[in-house]
Amino acid sequence: MEQYHGTTILSVRRQTADGIQVALGGDGQVTLGNIVVKGTARKVRKLYQGRVLAGFAGATADAFTLFERFEAKLEKHQGQLTRAAIELTKDWRTDRVLRRLEAMLAVADHSASLIITGNGDVLEPEQGIVAIGSGGAYAHSAAKALLSNTDLPAAEIVKKSLEIAGELCIYTNMHHTIETL
């Protein structure tokens, strides 16, 4: 799967006595080639009346187009995350304009966490961890270790994992946006 430079997006799900915790976060760095042009971008947001978390890796304008399309699919399918993701992916693969978009989405609600790609993939990774972007592998590894070996809440796991990714990936910074459900 192609990884885009310039960001790290991570989502973690954790079952607790109080229910399922879901957190999704990302760093704020935007690069143009090897130059940092912005350090405080917001690549994570809540969609569908605050019930869905979404983050992107890739071209910013493309990602905003995908956010709009994805939110429209969520509205059409009454917030059914998986169905909306599949419908978006169908459009992404068949529409001439959408087909050229270079971005990936990480989305989550209380029922699922998914990666949506322009290759036509809707992936639900195991263990409730979704990681995309250039620092995704670092953040995923850190989150997996923290999820297995600590009782930290999901949001804290996302925070600490993004910090570790920021220490290792030159395209990831320490300015984080973290949303929770």
UniProtKB/Swiss-Prot annotation:
UniProt-listed NCBIfam families: ATP_dep_HslV, PRK05456.1
Signal peptide feature range: none
Residues annotated as binding Na(+): G166, C169, T172
Keyword Heme: no
Primary localization class, coarse: cytoplasm
Subunit structure: A double ring-shaped homohexamer of HslV is capped on each side by a ring-shaped HslU homohexamer. The assembly of the HslU/HslV complex is dependent on binding of ATP.
EC code(s) of this entry: 3.4.25.2
Subcellular location: Cytoplasm
Origin species: Acidovorax ebreus (strain TPSY)
Reaction(s) the record says it catalyses: ATP-dependent cleavage of peptide bonds with broad specificity
Activity modulation comment: Allosterically activated by HslU binding.
Taxonomic superkingdom: Bacteria
GO CC, any one term: proteasome core complex
Keywords from the named record: Allosteric enzyme, Cytoplasm, Hydrolase, Metal-binding, Protease, Sodium, Threonine protease
Gene: hslV
Function (record text): Protease subunit of a proteasome-like degradation complex believed to be a general protein degrading machinery.
Active-site residue list: T7
EC class of the enzyme, as a word: hydrolase
Gene3D superfamilies per the UniProt record, alphabetical: Glutamine Phosphoribosylpyrophosphate, subunit 1, domain 1
GO terms, molecular function: metal ion binding; threonine-type endopeptidase activity
Name of this protein: ATP-dependent protease subunit HslV
Biological processes annotated in GO: proteolysis involved in protein catabolic process
Family: Belongs to the peptidase T1B family. HslV subfamily.
